[in-house]
Amino acid sequence: GCAYALARAGKTDLLLLDRADDVGEVTTSQGAGLCGQVRDAAERIKLAMHSVAVFRELQRSEVKPDWHEVGSVRIALSDRRAEEFRKLKQAADDAGLEADFIDRTEAKRRWPLMDFTQAASVLWCPSDGWMTPRHVAKSYEHACRKMGVRVATSTGVEEIRVKNGRVTEVKTNRGVVECKYVINAAGAHAYHIAKLAGLQLPIVPVRHEYYITLPMTGLSPDLPCFRIPEMTLYGRVRDGGLLLGGWEPKSLHLDPRSYGLNGTPTPVEADWQVLDSFEESFSQLFPAATGAEKGFVGKGWPTFTPDGRFIIGESCRVKGFVMAGGCNAHGISGSGGIGKLLVESLLERRPSAYVKSLSPDRFTETSWTWDEARVQAARVYETYYGV
């Protein structure tokens, strides 16, 4: 997404490095693929809206991201949550995003198999949707190559060379590359890449899981995505089955120092106690979920920051070293918007206050500790749907 945005802005002298044998085959392939735009602040909504615009654009290309603009329903089960929805609706209005309240009858028409009798409020966003994350990566890659961007897979970064406070070269397992800028969009390894440049940044991997059932009667691919904040659940239809995920109230998180640049985070084993709890909760609204045979389990370590904001932009401590990380589980769905913010941070003479607030320089080495960062980042995850 970053390379695509830069290339669209005319900066095509880019070399995209991926340690894996193919772009998007590791962490990206585990994503759930939902893209929601309703947020609590206009800046965040506009970021998500730009991502949707990019997915629409890519869907018209030869290699498609498998974008399905099916809309979404956000379901409140209490008056308190319904009040939050009213604030979200106002934020959407302020940002120019279409989002409307619908009654239970209309909600039932859009999602016939779901029971809306408990719903205190339902917020409908027609331009939300879902994509296939691996296809998104391949679509970006194809578009980038067409614009002249070079892509090198099976290429791992070993060293970032800095001279007089500025990035000059990157040493890889396949040779040395001279460069003026390094953009760090390395996900769970973003901490390690930053460390190579001499920066310590609090980028904390937190476990996340979802499951997909085998095909179920009545689930069609045009059904809307759904979010049920009080149950901390989200979902959609995938391959004729139910994709159901959630945000755990007691998260499992890692210290990125526990694995090296050439290593991998501890493999995530399916936690059936957690996954079954998702099923138990959702069965209150969708009884057919009870006992549905589970097939694929998606799992991984998306990275979170202590303040819940992305880390985007060039560091004043190491000129030419640019961050695009700590995406708080929105690296795929927000990729188009993140690319836009990155371009603004690098190419605009006066970036917006919002973009400036995402700077890596907000984390100085004396402003945080790892113990605090892990607790705070985990809290961001655990209160994702907090009121």
Task: List PLM regions with ranges.
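Short Gly/Ser/Thr- and Asp/Glu-enriched loop/turn motifs at secondary-structure junctions
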Residues: 30, 68-72, 206-207, 296-297
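Glycine-rich FAD pyrophosphate-binding loop
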Residues: 7-29
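Central helical "cap/lid" subdomain
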Residues: 24, 176-224
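Active-site lid/adjacent beta-loop-alpha segment flanking the redox-cofactor pocket in flavoenzymes
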Residues: 215-320
